[in-house]
Amino acid sequence: LVSPFKDTIEHHISTKIILLNGSNRVLGVSTVSEGTLSYNITDARFILQLAILSNCKGVIICINQPSGDLEPAKLDDELVEQIKIALSYVDVDLLDYILYCEEDYYSYSDNGKL
């Protein structure tokens, strides 16, 4: 997971979306937003737009954490709910929401939060 995003992993928060078809094959990867070292705004509408334009069936959201703090914040939980609701209207699944740094990651899916 870390390798494709290595250029920004320690410099600033960046949100990426992995777009998948019905067989979970990658259709594409896109940058959703980029922020500062400690702050980033991710818009669920832009994620929905990318999902519709790619005609995907599932998405994985990946957000690097330059600080190394992988504990999900309340804002992460709220964003996950917004994304799930938005995607449900167009029959697209949120397969995972991943916070990661160079050494480790936190997966909402692995932790039963989806």
Language model segments and positions:
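Active-site-proximal loop/helix of nucleotide/amide-processing enzymes and allied scaffolds
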Residues: 3, 21-23, 33, 37-114
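Long amphipathic N-terminal alpha/beta scaffold segment
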Residues: 1-27
